[in-house]
Regions:
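Enzyme catalytic cores with a strong preference for nitrogen-chemistry domains
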Residues: 1-302
Length: 302
């Protein structure tokens, strides 16, 4: 079995590096164990701006965390977008930020790309929503015997690949726990993504367990796609992950900081991005079949 896996590894295709850029992720910092429904959302934006002011960087791409900006629909006409557009121009950098866009009793979890001198270029609305986190299944029934005040609005799902365009070209984007699902990263890579961004938020948790799981998932997605992954979390962990899964740089929890590294924009498919789960399923079937056959032969010879 080990020989089969090693042989497959030797012939597996990979991505090819193209341009090298400087990339940064912004971690606003703050306390753990907080709730979005009872928190000051304006303060989250202010902490992102404060982190940038305290840690000036010369960078080509800057990624902000999930729900770094909260505004009312349409976000395209919001004051907050104007602030970020001006910032992108002043810094001469592409900003990938994440908006919580309130629309009545609903909201959208949207990542946007902002080019300097241009403003909003593209948006991606989160597709894979969190049940009981971003929406309540059977809300009409459950609200009869449960307090749903912390999830007062229902998230509206997006559609399409996890991808946003920018002057740097196509950028993959998976929001929060979408990084746990290979098909969301694959959708962006198949549409041309040369780098993966992952705005996320784990400030509602009181310990490091979920941030560690998120970072581990980002490392897996980096290896599968052979792409750099930029994970920006409001309170950590934020990280820049190399295509081989190595963590180039990582923040501490609750820290206000900006992480910066040289990264490659890469093209090409791996088996994971080209075929999805099929190769793993075939290998698993071969290993199980081989094990069953070996067991049968041992019983016959006994």
């Amino acid at each position: 079995a080990v020989g089969i896996l090693l042989g497959v590894a030797q012939i597996a295709p990979g991505a090819s590096p193209e341009d090298v850029i400087t990339a940064s992720v912004v971690q606003a910092g703050g306390d753990l164990g907080t709730r979005a429904a009872t928190s000051d959302q304006v303060a989250v934006l202010d902490r992102h701006l404060a982190a940038i002011e305290a840690n000036p960087v010369d960078t080509d791409l800057m990624v902000w965390s999930e729900s770094s900006v909260t505004t009312f629909a349409p976000l395209e006409q919001s004051r907050e977008l104007s602030i970020l557009s001006e910032l992108a121009t002043n810094l001469d950098t592409v900003i990938v930020a994440n908006f919580s866009e309130i629309d009545g009793d609903n909201f959208r979890n949207a990542s946007v790309s902002i080019d300097p001198g241009v403003g909003l270029v593209d948006r991606y609305d989160k597709v894979h929503l969190v049940p009981f986190g971003e929406y309540i299944p059977l809300r009409g029934l459950i609200e009869n015997f449960a307090d749903l005040s912390l999830i007062s609005r229902e998230a509206l799902p997006g559609s399409g690949p996890g991808l946003i365009q920018s002057r740097l070209g196509p950028i993959g984007n998976v929001i929060s726990f979408e990084v746990y699902f290979p098909e969301r990263v694959r959708s962006g890579v198949q549409s041309g993504a040369r780098i993966i961004t992952n705005p996320t938020l784990a400030s509602s948790y009181t310990n490091s367990l979920v941030p560690e799981q998120s970072l581990a998932s980002a490392r897996l997605r980096a290896i599968e796609s052979d792409r750099w992954v930029l994970q920006a979390s409001t309170t950590g962990y934020s990280a820049i992950v190399a295509p081989d899964g190595r963590v180039a740089v990582r923040s501490d929890l609750k820290q206000q900081t900006i992480l910066t590294s040289q990264v490659q924009l890469r093209t090409g498919d791996t088996w994971a991005t080209r075929f999805g789960k099929l190769p793993v399923s075939v290998l698993a079937a071969m290993l199980l079949g081989g094990s069953a056959l070996a067991g049968s032969r041992r019983r016959d010879s006994a």
